[in-house]
């Protein structure tokens, strides 16, 4: 499996090797051990730009995912899953509001975005699918915690 981590912000220190291990564990737990994933950590300005340009929403958000398996050429290379873009600024604010560690929130957002790329949806597929996604989040996050990654 190949996980590319790009950190485009400096405000919040991030251990990219450790984050890569988190991503690899998530992919393994989801049954994608031979897949490729790109993870970009940016700030609110960067994610706002992506949100505006690609999703038509001119505001920052916590995580955006782009699945490569969608569209006309989705089956071209099924091992390339897609991109997860996370705002470290938003993650830090959400962590502070929830009274949790920044690293924990960052890892959860990586998990959440990766679930979207692999077909899970909590926004458009109804309540049953949202519950299924939340259950998978709890299951894999517990795996990360038990493995000392969070």
From Swiss-Prot:
GO biological process assignments:
rRNA processing
Would you name any one GO CC term? cytoplasm
- Cofactor(s) demanded: Zn(2+)
State the InterPro entries in the record: MetalPrtase_cat_dom_sf_prd, YbeY
* Cofactor annotation remark: Binds 1 zinc ion.
Where, in this chain's numbering, is Zn(2+) bound?
Answer: 112, 116, 122
Instruction: Give one GO term, molecular function aspect.
Output: zinc ion binding
> Which keywords belong to this entry?
Cytoplasm, Endonuclease, Hydrolase, Metal-binding, Nuclease, Ribosome biogenesis, rRNA processing, Zinc
What are the EC numbers? 3.1.-.-
Q: Which SUPFAM superfamilies match?
A: Metalloproteases ('zincins'), catalytic domain
**Where in or outside the cell is it found?**
Cytoplasm
Member of which family? Belongs to the endoribonuclease YbeY family.
PANTHER family, alphabetized: ENDORIBONUCLEASE YBEY, CHLOROPLASTIC (PTHR46986:SF1)
* Function per UniProt: Single strand-specific metallo-endoribonuclease involved in late-stage 70S ribosome quality control and in maturation of the 3' terminus of the 16S rRNA.
* HAMAP family on file: Endoribonucl_YbeY
Q: What is this protein called?
A: Endoribonuclease YbeY
- What gene is this protein a product of? ybeY
């Amino acid at each position: 499996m190949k996980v590319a981590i790009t950190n485009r912000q400096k405000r919040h220190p991030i251990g990219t090797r450790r984050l890569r291990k988190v991503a690899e564990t998530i992919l393994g737990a989801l049954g994608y051990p031979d897949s490729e994933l790109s993870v970009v950590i940016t700030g609110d300005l960067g994610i706002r730009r992506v949100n505006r340009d690609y999703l038509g929403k001119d505001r920052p958000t916590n995580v955006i995912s782009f699945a490569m398996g969608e569209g006309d050429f989705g089956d071209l290379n099924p091992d390339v899953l897609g991109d997860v873009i996370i705002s470290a600024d938003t993650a830090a604010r959400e962590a502070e509001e929830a009274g949790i560690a920044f690293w924990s929130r960052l890892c959860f957002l990586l998990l959440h975005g990766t679930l979207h790329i692999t077909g899970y949806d909590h926004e458009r597929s109804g309540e049953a699918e949202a519950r299924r996604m939340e259950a998978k989040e709890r299951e894999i996050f517990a795996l990360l915690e038990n493995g000392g990654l969070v």
